[in-house]
Amino acid sequence: MSHAMALRQHARMQTNQGQDVANIAARLGQDQLHVWRLRYDRARRREPLCALLGVYLGVPGDAVSLVDGEHGRPELAEPLDRSLQFNWSHSGDAALIAVARGCAPGIDIEQLRPRPRAMPLAERFFHAEEIAALKALDSSDQEQAFLQLWTSKEAVLKAMGRGIAFGLDRLRLAVPPAPSRVLWLDGDDASMWQLHTLPVGKDCVANVAWRGATRMVEYWTLAEGG
């Protein structure tokens, strides 16, 4: 299976009463995955998430009810169309929402900041071969590579519907500067997994993952106030 990523990046979208977003949502196919970037406001909690999902579902945002899955992954509550799968992540004032049909995406974003404990954390939680590869990097590159691995692992685990408690050492990933890729996953076929780094700018690192065939990933920025 090819691990090449088909990615189209679009200019900032205006969401005038959701009309533009509705046009985008209507085009979501089984071979696509939509990723939205928006400003995270703690006071609004899941309101923007529900509003965006409502556009895809064709219902008002306040009609979108979410429930937590077995391991805390948010899901659409019945009787909503649960064939629409989503995941979201936020860090600082940035948030990402992944939306798909026919697969369960996992997404994770982290803001870049000094992480003096990056290597100790890696040595405690990561796979032995990842640790060795990180140690082989220049010290100036280790923190960025650590964050790339961390967000990638989070994305895969979230796509599985699991959390960190599953064990970060139970999956092994390609270590930067190699492209993102699942090399081994305990209890599953690693070649069935897609893992891609998202173009979120120099202030963050983000990855999206799903199990299944390659999809076209479309990346959008939701206008503030949308």
Mark where each language-model region is.
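Core catalytic alpha/beta fold that binds nucleotide/phospho-ligands
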Residues: 2-226
